[in-house]
Amino acid sequence: MEKTDSSPLSRQALYADKKQWNQFLSVFLLAVGVGFTVAGIIFFFAYNWDELPKFAKLGIVEVLLIASVLLVTFTRWNKLVKQILLTGATFLIGTLFAVFGQIYQTGADAYDLFLGWTLFTILWAVATRFAPLWLTFIGLLCTTIWLYNIQIANTNSWEMTLLANAVTWICALATIITEWMSTKGHLDRNNRWFVSLLSLATILHTSFLLMMAICEESAILSVPLISTVLLFSAELWYGWKVKSLFYLAIIPFAALMILLTTFISQSNLRDVQIFFYGGVIVITGTTLLIYIIL
């Protein structure tokens, strides 16, 4: 039996040293502090809305937003600190849009607010090249499309179906770009979570759309089915090529959930029988998945 390598070099590769822990805690606490500050501002307005005059409502948000931008622009702080501060300022933009809409009762739909928020965020995302800010931008863009779908598009129409699947392909395109950047070395290893989160969002969203289409008789099934087959095939091929356990595990599991949804929605069995056979499908499929992967 071979002995495990317990040399200092091996331990150094596995465990973080004191300097790395200090750096992690500094960044983590800074991000949490900025997040709680922005959340505190939002709850402050929610609690004191009736007591604050219009000037104070708009003035507080604008002063904080301008101060954040000035600190990012004219200070010599660490680049990461500036990026986190600018990400916090991005949420202040959304707060400003919401406050303005509530004060003057503009009558705008929710997707209008998120559309304006998205447009004002894209320049900062491009300029800073900061993964959390890019994630915020992609999330805002997808939320805008979904809100438009819910409020404007007709239920189960081609417009709703195509726009919903457009969200899937936005996440897929972002995944492809970040995977390519990671392969070419243009993406920091510390941002690998960003790639995994985008790919997870792509898989979950296309699976969700397909399961919804399966459960609703009047829904258009062809578009989400084609998207799911194409994306699952491409990601399985890529996962096999680069030996990525993430893709090889999550896609078969998503396919298992789609199969289970199809069985439940199309079967005429009683609840107890559905529960029993559904459990058999999940246990059998999960066991086979673990056996194949390991």
Descriptions of predicted regions:
Residues 1-294:
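Alpha-helical multi-pass membrane segments and their bilayer interfacial helix-loop junctions
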